[in-house]
């Protein structure tokens, strides 16, 4: 595992971002505000990880939506992805620790009001939630298909002086999977699936994360 991490750290610099993307976020006063990609880098922290949250979900995902709250009133196809939600439930708990050394943000194509409302309904308190509804970020970084369907990508950027460059993305999502397995592009991040991997039973078959049990 360390050998893979070392090889990743030794990757050559990626391409510079083509624009200083403008996202929508929540200001200190609680009002919507524009946030540039460059503003997601805090002093002394030159790496930024952005998780592209599938909100709206994949059109073929028929998993039941949230059982209550304002988000439950959305058409299923416009609602959030339950698998992404499970990952973000876990990242919210780790975000305070992560943010000591790394900038972290969660991006969704849904309007900001929907993203923030759902975050409150899930009890997320530490994740920085943003909307990319007004720009091409998702399409530019493999988090959106040409048809507009959202994809769950984790993308890392690095700041070098005044330049911001792409460093790494979870492109393993697009690689062929082992028989009967889901993509493991961000699998090392999730306690949920890694705990299953430690058991004699392994990962449960024919089971997916739900909004409520």
Locations of regions flagged by a protein language model:
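Non-globular targeting/processing and membrane-anchoring segments
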Residues: 1-48, 53-96, 100-101, 117-121, ...
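Conserved segment of the thioredoxin-like fold in thiol-based oxidoreductases
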Residues: 99, 103-131
